[in-house]
Amino acid sequence: MLLAWVHTFLLSNMLLAEAYGSGGCFWDNGHLYREDQPSPAPGLRCLNWLAAQGSRESLTEPSPGNHNYCRNPDQDPRGPWCYISSETGVPEKRPCEDVSCPETTSQAPPPSSAMELEEKSGAPGDKEAQVFPPANALPARSEAAEVQPVIGISQLVRMNSKEKKDLGTLGYVLGITMMVIILAIGAGIIVGYTYKRGKDLKEQHEKKACEREMQRITLPLSAFTNPTCETVDENTIIVHSNQTPADVQEGSTLLTGQAGTPGA
């Protein structure tokens, strides 16, 4: 799986390099240079790569192709260069000046080794020779390897998240069980709160009724007496002090006149 991602990454970088090449620029050591500059400096002219390498009889350096533009086949840290004709007529290596491409991009530069593997010699009559990347191209390859795991991990995480969506029967059962437990806990909390609230209200009502009963029992006596309205018992017997008159006996009556004198 990781190897497939590496191939995809390299292919995208190659396509990106071709896109920039078609626009007149190419990547080299993290920089963007102009592709069609045939002069290393004012007044100088680059020699054809095949002609210059053929005259030098050097097979260790890879050939950039059948053209005379500034390139960097040996990964020179100074940047692109080309061969020029010296005073003695021997091809001489000369770094190119002012070859920076005015276009900018935020994409990472493609590995130079992948570009070099795609380039082949275009000289007529010559056999096609396999071009091997130089030894100093390893840092660029290591930089690409450092970037690859990051992209691969993010893609793997997305794939794993998609695969984990299907929880299976056990997952659904556990999910439903957890939902039932949560709902039961919530219902228990609501019922408990309602029961406690009703019990508190009932106790308050009973307490108020008890207080009213105690107030009725412990009222002062003045609340039951009214001085303006006194009642008398109807069965009370009234005893008077009048004496019963005695019987009058004959001969005992006093002879008194109207004037009250005896014998009158």
UniProtKB/Swiss-Prot annotation:
Keywords: Cell membrane, Disulfide bond, Kringle, Membrane, Signal, Transmembrane, Transmembrane helix. Residues 24-101 form the Kringle domain. GO terms for biological process: negative regulation of phosphatidylinositol 3-kinase/protein kinase B signal transduction. It is a single-pass type I membrane protein. Pfam families: Kringle (PF00051). The chain crosses the membrane at residues 171-191. It comes from the Eukaryota. Residues 117-129 have a biased composition (Basic and acidic residues). Residues 192-264 are cytoplasmic. Residues 22-170 are extracellular. GO terms for cellular component: plasma membrane. Negative regulator of hepatic phosphatidylinositol 3-kinase (PI3K) activity. This is Phosphoinositide-3-kinase-interacting protein 1. It comes from Mus musculus.
